[in-house]
Amino acid sequence: MWPLDNKRESMIYQRKNNQVSYGEAIGILLLDSPVPFIPGDVANATSYAFPVRFKKVVGFSVKKAIGGDKGIYPALLCAARDLKDNGVRAITGDCGFMALHQNRLKKDLNMPVFLSSLLQIPFIRQLIPENQKIGIITASQRNLTEPFLETIGIKEKNGLVVAGLENSPEFKSAVLDEKGSLDSKKMEAEVLEKAGTLLKKHKDMGAILLECSLLPPYAKGVADKTGLPVFDYMTMIDFVFSAVVKKKYRGYM
């Protein structure tokens, strides 16, 4: 830390609990999945302009996440506590369907928790005119139900238009079937096709939200194609980081 006169400040630091490393403000709970996580993905460290700390939730598969398996919660809580014990200031996840555990986990940890990209929906609604819709591109349209959304305080789906990738060949084989490889060009084409279809059907769409944590690499393409604001996991994580790690401003007048 450097003061304005460019002389090093004298500071005394104290160790915290049993930590052996420091400076990772955002903790990320990862699914137990063999999918390749490319730059831009939530599970790729090069996606961030700041250090993050990852923790795999053993046994928490993609199918369990999308299927709403409540039995995985003890493993999720154990992994989250490890992140907390290692000094993170806020905890997120790498699947929008982790929203099922949002309220319980934040209460049990007593710290900021933001597991799902879908938490941005109320914020986006306030940004755009009331007569405009939010387009959501998700890993599973079938599972993005009103009861599920109610778990994070979204009372109804009015104003939300949804397109699912569960039947898109590359997404299905790479993500849902976990074949162990991913063709990013094919994946991007599938995401852009869904975005284009949504916009064609709903010309009153005012913003797009990419639910799945694997989709941020394609967000710029979606924005370029549609001309709309695009939200995803990375917009949410960057936003929360800016709240839990405050910037010291410097300049002149």
Regions from the PLM with identified roles:
Residues 104-128, 223-240:
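Short, acidic/small-residue loops that bind anionic groups at enzyme active sites
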Residues 90-102, 114-120, 139-143, 211-217, ...:
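Gly/Ser/Thr-rich loops at beta-strand to alpha-helix junctions
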Residues 2-73, 140-182:
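N-terminal glycine-rich anion-binding loop in soluble enzyme alpha/beta folds
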Residues 84, 125, 199-201:
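Non-catalytic positions within long, well-ordered alpha-helices that form the structural scaffold/packing
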Residues 74-79, 97-104, 108:
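N-terminal active-site wall of soluble small-molecule enzyme domains
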Residues 187-204, 217:
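A short, acidic, amphipathic alpha-helical segment used as a generic capping/interface helix at domain edges
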Residues 215-217, 231-253:
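C-terminal functional extensions of proteins
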Residues 66-79, 186-194:
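Glycine-rich, highly charged phosphate/nucleotide-binding loops
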